[in-house]
Every structure is written in structure tokens, then in C-alpha cells.
């Protein structure tokens, strides 16, 4: 569901939900989201800006409160995950195995407020990193499906 419309996307099922993970590029395939965004340097820049905003902006306080005292581990894990999710190197899987996103997020209270703050923070990071607007919109749609699936509390 979420992968539909992403460039080069075939989709990938994670925990029963389709995500934007792309297939590896071939000579005949379209570029992946990983390619279109600019590879590892661009993904790292996006992740770093996302967590910088989470730390700085009061609008993301509820989201920040769900995280630990420091964001270093979260930065690395999201970077590793997004690289593979967008069709690049599978750094996360190589280190930790299958993402099991919902299971890994169950210990953290995630409701509509946290979901919406995550999405707003990522959208702001994509704008500030000047991600192509068409790609950013497609990623935002895929992020919504995954973020909504992470909810484990009301409100």
C-alpha cells in the first residue's frame, strides 16, 4: 500500500504492512528513492536534521519525550533503516536482522500525537534539506502508513 507510486518501488512487507523498501537497482529498473534522494550522505543529512529538530523545536516535545536522554543510537538506527527502506544498502538488517518495526516500538507509548509529531518533524527535515518535493511527498505518504501502524495507544 505505502510503496505504490514510489519511484522504482516494488514494496516490501514488514510485519504485514507494505513499506517503501525498494528493490536493488538494475540496468532496466528505475532509480530507487535511495538513489533519488542522493545516497548515504543525503539520508544521513536528513536523519541528522530530523533529530536536531526533535531536540530543538517545542512542537516536537511529546515525540522527544518518547526517546532516551541522548539521540545518538536513534540517529544511527534510523539512518541504517532508511538506507535499506529506500532501496540502498541493508545496514540495519545486517546489524539487527529483520526490522520488526512494530515489535521494536511496542515499549514506547505512541499515539496520534506522537505519530503526527514524527511526521511533521520528518516533513520539516525534508523541506529544510531541500528534498525534491515530489519525492518528499511520496516518502511522506509511505511514512504515514508506517507511522500510523506504530500507534499502540489511544490519542
Q: For each of these PLM feature ranges, what is it?
A:
Residues 1-17:
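Compositionally biased, low-complexity flexible segments
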Residues 35-43:
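Long, hydrophobic N-terminal alpha-helical segment
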Residues 36, 106-108, 151:
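A short, structure-level motif marking secondary-structure boundaries and short turns
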Residues 143-155:
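Short amphipathic alpha-helical segments at helix boundaries and their inter-helical linkers
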